[in-house]
A protein has these predicted regions:
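S-adenosylmethionine/decaboxylated-SAM
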Residues: 1-132
Length: 132
């Protein structure tokens, strides 16, 4: 899920809105690079539009969160997907030190998510069977 198109928005909790380099050319390159993955599908829309349009889709088994990087937006997305996550679903969060990951982890605990692994810039949470 990524609209691309050089949109101006607030990228981080403590930064003003600005335009980054997420161009349509980058989108084209991504689609070409991932074209051999038959199950890959890019939704070139905002996360809010995706959640409004595809609210009936579930269950999800894997979600990679790679933007936005504001705590409130990541939290909104994480809870939305957690409500639709199947058992053993994994959530991978990119650049997690840039937002309030402890808050997000805490919010996901009632859904059964526990930390599986954490590195310098990525963290993986997994939904355990029966919230164990």
């Amino acid at each position: 899920i990524d609209p691309y198109g050089n949109l101006k928005y607030q990228h981080y909790d403590n930064s003003p809105a600005y335009t980054a380099d997420y161009t349509d050319e980058m989108k084209d390159r991504l689609q070409k690079d991932l074209s051999s993955y038959k199950n890959f599908e890019l939704f070139a829309i905002t996360d809010t539009d995706f959640m409004n349009i595809y609210h009936h889709y579930s269950p999800y088994c894997f979600v990679h969160f790679d933007g936005p990087h504001m705590t409130r937006d990541v939290l909104t997305e994480a809870v939305w997907f957690a409500n639709r996550a199947g058992t053993n679903c994994r959530f991978v969060f990119d650049d997690y030190p840039k937002y309030n990951m402890p808050l997000i982890q805490s919010a996901l605990e009632p859904f059964g998510f526990k930390k599986l692994e954490a590195g310098k810039n990525k963290i993986c949470l997994e939904k355990r069977r029966n919230n164990l």
